[in-house]
Amino acid sequence: MAAGLRLGPLLRYVDWETGEHATVWIEADRPCTAEVRCLGAPPGEGAVPGGGDTAASGVLGTEGSPDDSRAGSPKGAGGSSRTFQIEGHHYALIPVSGLTPASSTAYEVLLDGRRVWPPAEWPYPPSVIRTPAIPAEGVRVSFGSCRWAAPPAREHDPIGPDALDTLAARMAAEPEGERPDVLVLLGDQVYADATSRETQRWLATRRDLSEPPGAEVADYEEYTRLYEESWLDPVVRWLLSTVPSCMIFDDHDVIDDWNTSASWVAEMRAKPWWRERILSGLMSYWVHQHLGNLSPAELADDPVYAAVRATPDGTDALRSFAARADADPASVRWSHRRDFGRTRLLMIDTRAARVLDERHRAMLDDEEMRWLRGQALEAPGSYDHLLLGTSLPWLLPPAIHDVESWNAALCRGERGERWARVGEDLRRRADLEHWAAFPSSFEELASLIREVGSGPLAPSTVCVLSGDVHHAYVAEPHWPDPEPSTRVLQLTCSPVHNAIHASMRVGFRFGWSRLGRRFGHAMARHGRAGRPVIRWDKTGGPWFGNQLMTLTLNGRSADLRLDQAVTDRTGTRLLTMDERNLTDGP
């Protein structure tokens, strides 16, 4: 039987240094050679059956028919890769070479030489790989977090229209209109602990849901179901095939409150189902999200990628890696960097890299912080904008920041053992685990941003991109003199598709108020928590709804737009709620 396409394609990486390379991720239903062939490549030129990664050769067109050879179209663009196997699933990350800068090239996917993408009678525009001009003139980045898979079209959606679906539908209707150059997905791409009714029915065919972990996922196969449910949504499938993406996990990609504290970890490790859950969560994240974050050069040097491809079944190799990552988080780095011309993006792991000893709590372990500092400070003057992608906001509403620092002080024993027990219970119930709950890390990040933003070679902006909190806002910090010359902003955008309780809306609004600030200060004094070295103010929001933010960065200019998905008598659309220039003052 011929190989079929089970999931994907996802266009994950496009090279902004030369404009010649890309990677495309797929899952097939059996072992095969997966090939990306740009339109116009002669049959058989792109793949070597049974071989490793190879560049295709042949005459290719740009968004045209096979004989389209208009000027500027890439010649010889394509590539292939043999699938690797994990837990009975078959994946490939296909390197595409030979692209031309400043081009838009339609592509198809073949498995063992048979075309499987796009499907027959596919209603959406061609999947294309768009490459930047070299040097790049600018970049448009759309970002958000927290996407619960939309229900099938025939079902009512109680949490409103999906912002990613709505963006995809708009792009499909206007293929030559505005589109992001990259999607930055800041965590909770799937919800392992909050499964849909349809997934729960499927889980019930596999095991008894009255036994732990109940209606949550339990193993690798069940994690793959979440990605299928999320990424097989037809219009989102098309979107991910044509817009590159960077991803980082948050807790729900594995389990709610993941790594919130040392006592939480100890309790989870005592549960008989936990080891399979955490290893499967890390394995599925590596396959579906992390691998595509890496450049072709990084992939070539990655020992885990080499190990899983060196054997007919890479499950044991990847499982061993996941076990090491769980036992010794400092031995693994999930954080990664992408450069988009003169914009540098650093995606920061704020879940697995934590130090949980109450007396030495840190959001990032020493090695992770050294990596972050090194990447942020490398080659001063070589970038105009620094984007720090962290699933958890650095700057929260001030009252909530103070409550989290108060809670952290209680948990480390500042008010005695009884208050420490109260603090731990509250930490878990209220999700008090953002940067504010790691005071030394909060200050260290503030210090790094100030260092980056000072001096004659400082970038125009440093933007901290975050999600998690199911609303959106813009906040701006202020340091004691001297202030950095760079404009620094916290840009929080969440959810893409989820809900927030009315009580939480009230709480977040209160957190920004003067009364809220006074309440927070009182709590911090009770916990004997120190005051932060910076202050900050909200300059936009809060906005509640399913939404995406888009940054347009061109030269040293930066513009921000917030779009919400809304439904009215005319249908579902993206409504712009806020639009501002970030480099001409507040």
List the model feature ranges, each with a label.
Residues M1-G64, D68-P586:
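Metal-dependent phosphoester/phosphodiester hydrolase catalytic core
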